[in-house]
């Protein structure tokens, strides 16, 4: 059940950050829409990785952050590759890097707070 909280809280946190960065206000419809937008990539990419890493739980592990960053860059490359115009380079888009780092960092923080145990 805590896996669900991690995914939901991460998606909601990212929707709030998206609203602050791009919309510059809190519009309920935008928060809900963006939460769903962030929810599905988290379910597809981060949740399986989280379940695998929870076999050896470590709170705020830099290695786990690197794993989440790798998954976030792959997920964002797929999503940005589908959504951006064909003439634009993916690696010149600052939003690509911003969202890859933010999605990984937010998920890592919620994962560490809710699920990971202190390292013995």
From Swiss-Prot:
One of its GO terms (cellular component) is plasma membrane. It is a multi-pass membrane protein. InterPro entries: UPF0715. Its main location: membrane. The keyword Ribonucleoprotein does not apply. Keywords: Cell membrane, Membrane, Transmembrane, Transmembrane helix. It is found in: Cell membrane. The chain crosses the membrane at residues 3-23, 26-46, 63-83, 95-115. Belongs to the UPF0715 family. This is UPF0715 membrane protein YwlA. The gene is ywlA.
């Amino acid at each position: 059940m805590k896996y669900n909280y991690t995914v939901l809280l991460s998606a909601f946190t990212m929707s709030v950050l998206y609203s602050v960065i791009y919309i510059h206000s809190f519009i309920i419809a935008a928060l809900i829409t963006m939460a769903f937008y962030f929810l599905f990539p988290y379910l597809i990419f981060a949740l399986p990785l989280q379940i695998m890493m929870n076999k050896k739980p470590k709170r705020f592990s830099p290695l786990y952050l690197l794993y989440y960053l790798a998954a976030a860059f792959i997920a964002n490359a797929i999503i940005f590759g589908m959504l951006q115009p064909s003439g634009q380079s993916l690696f010149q888009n600052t939003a690509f890097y911003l969202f890859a780092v933010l999605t990984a960092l937010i998920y890592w923080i919620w994962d560490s707070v809710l699920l990971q145990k202190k390292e013995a």
